[in-house]
C-alpha cells in the first residue's frame, strides 16, 4: 500500500513538473507608455505595446480588459509561437473627460505562466473639457 501511495505521489509531481515546463510567457518591451501632453481639442491617442513570447508554448490572449470605456484595446487573437513577437494597440479617447493627468490600466488574460498581466497608458490632456 505504501508503495502504491508513493508511486502515485511521484507520478503526480512528475506530471506537474512537465506541464509547468511547457508554458507561454509574456515579456513586454514596456509596461507603461506615456503618450505625453496633448490638447483636449485632439483627445485621441494611440499606444502600441509590443511583447515577445519567451515561453516554450504558444501564447494565447484570451481577453483584454480596459479599466475605462475611454480606452479601447485591439489585438490579434491568433496564438503567438515561442520566440515570436505580438502587439496590443490601445486607443485612448479623452473626449468629454476631465483634463489633467490620466493613467488607465489594461488587464490581459492569457494562457501564460502569469494568467493576468497589466499594462498602462498615461498622459496629460490640457485645455477645456
Features from the language model and the residues they span:
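Sec-dependent N-terminal signal peptides
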Residues: 4-14
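Boundary at the C-terminal end of the N-terminal hydrophobic targeting segment
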Residues: 10, 18-22
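Beta-sheet-dominated interaction scaffolds and their linkers
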Residues: 21-50, 54, 125-129
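Short, solvent-exposed loop/turn segments enriched in Ser/Thr/Gly
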Residues: 42-48, 97-105
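Short, acidic/polar linear motifs in exposed loop/turn regions
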Residues: 54-57, 96, 112
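Surface-exposed binding patches on compact interaction domains or structured appendages
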Residues: 56-87
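Short, exposed beta-strand-loop hairpins at the edges of beta-sheets
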Residues: 107-115
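C-terminal edge beta-strand
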Residues: 117-125
Amino acid at each position: 500500500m505504501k508503495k502504491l501511495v508513493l508511486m502515485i505521489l511521484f507520478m503526480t509531481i512528475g506530471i506537474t513538473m512537465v506541464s509547468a515546463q511547457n508554458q507561454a510567457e509574456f515579456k513586454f518591451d514596456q509596461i507603461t507608455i506615456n503618450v505625453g501632453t496633448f490638447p483636449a481639442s485632439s483627445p485621441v491617442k494611440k499606444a502600441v505595446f509590443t511583447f515577445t513570447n519567451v515561453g516554450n508554448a504558444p501564447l494565447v490572449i484570451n481577453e483584454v480588459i480596459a479599466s475605462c470605456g475611454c480606452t479601447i484595446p485591439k489585438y490579434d487573437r491568433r496564438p503567438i509561437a515561442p520566440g515570436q513577437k505580438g502587439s496590443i494597440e490601445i486607443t485612448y479617447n479623452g473626449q468629454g473627460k476631465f483634463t489633467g493627468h490620466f493613467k488607465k490600466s489594461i488587464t490581459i488574460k492569457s494562457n501564460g505562466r502569469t494568467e493576468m498581466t497589466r499594462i498602462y497608458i498615461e498622459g496629460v490632456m490640457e485645455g477645456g473639457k
